[in-house]
């Protein structure tokens, strides 16, 4: 029974990619828990799930700067799976990257992303490798922001159903202050993932910033639209901190007083979040409450 619970917990963390948001202490705890579990000999662990968990262990070790241990995990998987799957390709590029060889990682991936690979491989393989290449170029400052955006937009033309590409494009447009284009990209994300509460929150935030620099009539229209998206985000996730903060801020920007139902409700929800949520959300909620 205990092994069943641990297995399901670890697989859930892997499938949701929750570990990518863990702090150093949580990563260390996860690493130790995984190593103990993997040595426990769980007969109910399928081969496929074994590889999934080993993949997560690899990235946990990378995040913790355990380069040697990460290499050992990679070697274990390579001996079992070979080097040709896109996940192994991305792992190899990651190892090159963390060992300070960004140029080698870029050349390795670019050599794979030739015309033959584009047309001979499946969608997941090509787009996954292409996204990894862009990520390395971005962190290594190999490309300007405009060049990165050009590559991402080119990929959205080829793979319009990849929500992550549209999200990445929206983030770049947002940083460049091109809020209208950022909103368009976020709307594409919602067409693909219609229950993505975080995306509704980000769209609301982007519309809010666009409204702040717009003329009065347009500003009100944009704020109303931003409020609608913020409300949708908290409809999908009742204790979504960012969503309730936006509901409060946008309602105030629209000129509503403290007795307004939405302002009272959002303040109440922020208090609930400060009492119930994780430490990070608690602190953030309390800071917001102090300002309102």
Swiss-Prot record:
InterPro entries cross-referenced by the UniProt entry: EMC2-like, TPR-like_helical_dom_sf, TPR_rpt
Compartment annotation: Endoplasmic reticulum membrane
Disulfide-bond pairs as recorded: none
GO biological process, any: phospholipid metabolic process
Entry keyword set: Endoplasmic reticulum, Membrane, TPR repeat
Protein family according to the UniProt entry: Belongs to the EMC2 family.
Function: Part of the endoplasmic reticulum membrane protein complex (EMC) that enables the energy-independent insertion into endoplasmic reticulum membranes of newly synthesized membrane proteins. Preferentially accommodates proteins with transmembrane domains that are weakly hydrophobic or contain destabilizing features such as charged and aromatic residues. Involved in the cotranslational insertion of multi-pass membrane proteins in which stop-transfer membrane-anchor sequences become ER membrane spanning helices.
Other information: Present with 5740 molecules/cell in log phase SD medium.
Name of the molecule in the record: ER membrane protein complex subunit 2
Organism: Saccharomyces cerevisiae (strain ATCC 204508 / S288c) (Baker's yeast)
Classification lineage: Eukaryota, Fungi, Dikarya, Ascomycota, Saccharomycotina
């Amino acid at each position: 029974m205990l092994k069943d619970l641990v297995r399901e917990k670890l697989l859930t963390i892997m499938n949701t990619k929750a570990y990518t948001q863990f702090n150093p202490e949580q990563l260390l705890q996860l690493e130790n828990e995984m190593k103990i579990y993997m040595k426990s000999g769980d007969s109910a662990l399928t081969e496929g799930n074994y590889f999934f968990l080993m993949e997560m262990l690899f990235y946990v070790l990378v995040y913790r700067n355990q380069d040697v241990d990460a290499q050992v995990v990679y070697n274990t998987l390579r001996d079992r799976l070979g080097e040709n799957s896109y996940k192994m390709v991305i792992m190899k590029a990651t190892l090159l990257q963390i060992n300070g060889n960004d140029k080698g990682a870029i050349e390795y991936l670019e050599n794979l992303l030739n015309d033959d690979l584009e047309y001979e491989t499946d969608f997941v393989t090509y787009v996954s490798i292409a996204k990894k290449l862009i990520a390395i170029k971005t962190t290594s400052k190999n490309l300007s922001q405009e060049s990165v955006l050009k590559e991402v937009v080119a990929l959205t033309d080829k793979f319009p159903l990849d929500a992550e590409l549209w999200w990445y494009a929206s983030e770049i447009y947002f940083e460049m202050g091109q809020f209208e284009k950022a909103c368009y990209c976020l709307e594409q994300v919602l067409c693909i993932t219609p229950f993505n509460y975080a995306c509704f929150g980000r769209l609301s935030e982007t519309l809010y910033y666009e409204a702040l620099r717009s003329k009065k009539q347009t500003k009100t229209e944009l704020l109303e639209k931003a409020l609608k998206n913020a409300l949708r985000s908290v409809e999908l996730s009742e204790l979504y901190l960012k969503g309730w903060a936006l509901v409060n801020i946008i309602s105030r920007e629209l000129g509503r007083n403290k007795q307004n139902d939405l302002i009272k409700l959002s303040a109440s929800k922020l208090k609930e979040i400060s009492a119930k949520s994780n430490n990070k959300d608690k602190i953030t909620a309390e800071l917001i409450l102090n300002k309102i």
